[in-house]
């Protein structure tokens, strides 16, 4: 066997110590390179204040739903007109 190190009273092989050192270094580096989340916190707080004041945050989604419904109704009306014209032609 080769040399081994004693860490906190346990015998640790050199390759395990090297791998754990690389992992710890990568973890610390990634922790300090992440950007703070101050922008997201500001957005969340404004959404909470809108909900508390009674304003609906889903108003845009409801407007989009209305547009989709109108589009579907228009498509169905056009389809009915086309089928009527086809039946009259036959």
Curated annotation (Swiss-Prot):
Glycan attachment residues as annotated in the record: 44
InterPro entries documented for this protein: ATP19 (IPR021278)
Region Disordered, annotated ranges: 34-65
Any single GO CC term annotated in Swiss-Prot or TrEMBL for this entry: mitochondrion
Alphabetical GO biological process terms: calcium ion homeostasis; proton motive force-driven ATP synthesis
UniProtKB keywords: Glycoprotein, Membrane, Mitochondrion, Transmembrane, Transmembrane helix
Biased composition (Polar residues): 43-60
Membrane topology: Single-pass membrane protein
Protein name: Uncharacterized protein YOR020W-A
Transmembrane segments: 15-34
Location(s) in or outside the cell: Mitochondrion membrane
């Amino acid at each position: 066997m080769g040399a081994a190190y004693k860490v906190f009273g346990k015998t640790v092989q050199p390759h395990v110590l090297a791998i754990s050192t690389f992992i710890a270094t990568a973890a610390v580096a990634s922790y300090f390179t992440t950007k703070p989340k101050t922008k997201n916190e500001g957005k969340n707080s404004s959404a909470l204040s809108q909900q508390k004041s009674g304003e609906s945050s889903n108003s845009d989604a409801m407007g989009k739903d209305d547009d989709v419904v109108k589009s579907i109704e228009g498509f169905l009306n056009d389809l009915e007109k086309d089928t009527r014209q086809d039946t009259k032609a036959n």
